[in-house]
Amino acid sequence: MAKPETLKRVLKEQHIDKNVVEKINDGYENVNNKSPKKKKAEYLFHAVDEMDSSLDKESCRQIMELCACTIDSSGLNKIVAQFAEKTNGLSLKEKIEKLANINHLGNPALREDGTMLVDLGSGSTCPCPQISGIEINNPISFTYCMCCGGHLKYQYENALGIRLEVEIKSSILQSMGKKPCVFILVKRDA
């Protein structure tokens, strides 16, 4: 999930209505990336609830995808760039099999229909570093998880050299730990 400062920046960059942004940040104006984890989680869950009630689904998706924490991760970006260079010329299936060896990219599988299924988090603990260890008492909207979706989309596009769309199949947060975090990546036309 987004860091609080990233979400606040993306809301501005996407020209979200000032009144909506005020509702999202109301009471959380001073929450930043250095705030205690519990306070950050409280703000982020509140922000997602406000976004879901004030914005259309596609706007929520775009905002959260742009908040992906690894977009600015020079370490992972370098590893993915090296992977893309080393696997140039391999089939999509071969590349996907090798992607499973890179930390933080989940367990990918190429399906017969050409889509990719990526298991990002199994068990009952959300893989999101912004909320790990925080007790979750209610189901959390898929909107929250689109940040991880954006992470996968960004890294897989760079690793595979193709344009992708991402969908959420299931989420630990939304299912209260009953289902894993699974995403579907679909190749899209350029």
Whereabouts are the PLM-identified features?
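N-terminal accessory segment detector
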Residues: M1-I140, E165, K178, R188-A190
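Active-site helix/loop of acyl-thioester processing domains in fatty-acid/polyketide metabolism
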Residues: F142-G161
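Secondary-structure-rich domain cores
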Residues: N158-E165, P180-F183
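Short, solvent-exposed loop/turn elements at beta->coil junctions and helix N-caps
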Residues: I168-Q174
